[in-house]
Amino acid sequence: MTELLARQLEKTAGITMTGVTFRGTGPAVQEIAAGRLDFMVGPLAVTIPLHEAKKVKIIGMTSPERLPVAPDVPTLKEQGTDIVNYGWWGVCAASGTPRPILETLNKHVAAAVASADFKSVIEKTGVIPVSSSIDEFAAIIADTAKEAGAMIKELGIEQLD
């Protein structure tokens, strides 16, 4: 999604950016912190520590509202764009895993997410911990795929062979 969000920002701002492909967020964050990369779209979980250390400046968030972990950072919507998007993390199992096993796994994940210890750690990264049912999570995945497909179509991105 970060590539799609960068392209959406490029279109909204009416600018042209040169994309640089990295093997994951880690190398990109290292390059921006070292001053060899001018701009990136990335997850708060890895950029907040650098923002707090004044090694990078987060100029906007795609979340619907400002987040407690970075109250000084405005949303892109506050800055006049229609860009609102937030990522999610989930626990997945192999296709064909029996439903009772999925339900047991989901129950334990929900308990972990609700724990004070987990919340105290994860909220420092800008993540708002929530849990969902198996079916709710399946709907989130489907909705995300639908939104990404619409963005790809809107931005005129063609499939590479």
Residue ranges, per PLM feature:
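Conserved, function-defining micro-sites of small-solute handling proteins
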Residues: M1-D161
